[in-house]
A protein has these predicted regions:
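Iron-sulfur-associated redox domains of electron-transfer enzymes in respiratory
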Residues: 1-250
Length: 250
């Protein structure tokens, strides 16, 4: 659920930046609200990645998406919407995230991840820590009785399913933007993915928006260019392009 939430937020934010730049609105949307126009927009789901940019590329922070990571979004939703829905005081809810990355422990302590002194997520367990706890408790999953899946906020979509693989966030965000602008799903054959020669961990993709809904007519014919990388070598190369103003991506 929260992966879908992140995808919708990031996709909508990217669309807002494209609108502001291509419609010549400058730093405000049609309602006069401020809009970050920095392109390319960079995903903000990894706390380790955020820390790297803060230290190595502090002048490029405007390029980061304003979106929280999925598990901190979920924590915020649980302590607001879910708390209200169930009649529970937010202070009586304790949110624990099970994550594969130890940097998530640091992430939940950042000041951006709390409101009025209330953390979005109270604790993080790594998957390895959870596995140890399961073994210590002697839980035998093979012989546990069947139970119903608990989905208090609904199920996820296919876009959320690919979220965890390299490039999954980008593909999901592109799908969202394309569907918002055209009213149709993104045909996979229209997504042209190209590896960068000599750097296998970086790949680029482009999609040309051929037809649009009336309100997005200014995006007709626009080709959106994106890049995906795994590892800091490729990421640093892309960030250097951003820093020197030669990045061709959105």
């Amino acid at each position: 659920f929260s992966a879908d939430l992140t995808i919708l937020e990031e996709g909508t934010e990217l669309l807002g930046r494209l609108n502001a730049v291509l419609k010549g609105q400058g730093a405000q949307d049609g309602d006069g609200h401020p809009v970050n126009t920095a392109l390319p927009m960079i995903t903000s789901c990894s706390p380790g990645w955020i820390k790297h940019i803060e230290h190595q590329f502090p002048d490029e922070l405007d390029h980061l998406s304003s979106c929280k990571s999925p598990h901190t979004m979920m924590g915020a939703v649980v302590k607001t919407f879910y708390a209200e829905r169930t009649g529970t005081a937010p202070k009586d809810l304790f949110v624990v995230s099970v994550m594969p990355c130890t940097a998530k422990k640091y992430e939940i302590q950042r000041p951006e991840m709390e409101v009025d002194g209330q953390r979005d997520v109270d604790a993080v367990l790594t998957t390895r820590e959870l596995a140890r706890m399961i073994k210590m408790a002697g839980i035998d999953f093979v012989n546990l009785p069947e139970g119903e899946f608990d989905a208090p906020l609904g199920l996820g979509t296919g876009a959320a399913d690919i979220f965890g693989v390299t490039g999954g966030v980008m593909e999901a965000a592109l799908r969202t933007v394309y569907e918002l602008v055209t009213g149709n799903e993104l045909p996979f054959e229209k997504l042209h993915v190209t590896p960068i020669v000599g750097l296998d961990q970086v790949k680029t993709a482009s999609i040309t928006i051929e037809e649009t809904l009336p309100e997005y007519g200014h995006l007709k014919g626009v080709t959106v260019n994106v890049a995906v990388t795994s590892g800091l070598e490729g990421a640093s190369m892309l960030m250097k392009e951003v820093a020197n103003g030669t990045s061709p991506y959105h």
